[in-house]
Amino acid sequence: MVIIRLARGGSKKRPFYNIVATDSRNRRDGRFIERVGFYNPVATKGESLRIAQDRLTYWQGVGAQLSPTVERLVKEAAKAQPAA
């Protein structure tokens, strides 16, 4: 099963997460199919969250499940974008 989840990067005490589509049996930071965004929880001035919405929609369309944390981040990103 394909799952969209966070893969941790960064250094000690300075986490950085890639939002990736991966097989659920792979390790957290292991092999992934596609990187669809990033989340930087310690960003001060720069962009802290970016999600390629078109790719996220594609993966959900082919049956990928979102992890609970990624689901929360997607909702947060939707609120942050101005209504068009």
Swiss-Prot record:
Entry's Gene Ontology cellular component terms: cytoplasm; small ribosomal subunit
Classification via Gene3D superfamilies: 3.30.1320.10
GO MF terms held by the record: structural constituent of ribosome
Alphabetic keyword roster: Ribonucleoprotein, Ribosomal protein
GO BP terms: translation
Pfam family for this entry, one: Ribosomal_S16
PANTHER family: 30S RIBOSOMAL PROTEIN S16, SMALL RIBOSOMAL SUBUNIT PROTEIN BS16M
NCBIfam families according to UniProt: S16
Similarity comment: family membership: Belongs to the bacterial ribosomal protein bS16 family.
Protein name in UniProt: Small ribosomal subunit protein bS16
Gene name, Swiss-Prot/TrEMBL: rpsP
